[in-house]
């Protein structure tokens, strides 16, 4: 994947704020080397690149049940989080951080893999259901609201990709080479619009990301 710093020239007045600025970015995945390259860790992949872009690094924070990185962007504090609770208990970590920093659900952006989108596609969404994604389900319960933002990174579904795997097995395996290349391209596209989301301009971020999906 290209090593590009997307945040270096962003000005505070570059975007028209239309929603609450994002103050907590959560990448979802499972901890440990056994899961590092699996589809379910797409949120971790993007979070790692955002930490690079924001010139910060993750460190273990046991009290928050996760890896935390702190940064400043456009004069505001931003926290990045990778829960180490395993996917199904992500809310334990997200809830702890949100309570500590007194953040509303609308100030939280969750990066996660999405079965209903093909590799190479990505969508932004606020609120709604969890569509069977156990990480989102647990976060919704922990925050007491579905109104957090989601950045849905397409990994495809076994059926849409012509595979016989069960979903539970599919998400815990690495993407095929072509799929990985498509996901990497999407991650670069996401990195380019995260500054807009940090400023609260989800209209711009949505227009840029959805317009490039090609389907």
Swiss-Prot record:
Pfam families per UniProt: Pept_tRNA_hydro (PF01195)
EC number in record: 3.1.1.29
This protein's record includes keyword NAD: no
The keyword Signal is annotated on this UniProt entry: no
Signal peptide range in chain numbering: none
Catalytic activity: an N-acyl-L-alpha-aminoacyl-tRNA + H2O = an N-acyl-L-amino acid + a tRNA + H(+)
Enzyme active site: 40
Domain of life, per lineage: Bacteria
Sorted UniProt keywords: Cytoplasm, Hydrolase, RNA-binding, tRNA-binding
Any one cellular-component term (Gene Ontology): cytoplasm
Function: Hydrolyzes ribosome-free peptidyl-tRNAs (with 1 or more amino acids incorporated), which drop off the ribosome during protein synthesis, or as a result of ribosome stalling. Catalyzes the release of premature peptidyl moieties from peptidyl-tRNA molecules trapped in stalled 50S ribosomal subunits, and thus maintains levels of free tRNAs and 50S ribosomes.
Family as reported in the entry's similarity comment: Belongs to the PTH family.
Name this polypeptide is given: Peptidyl-tRNA hydrolase
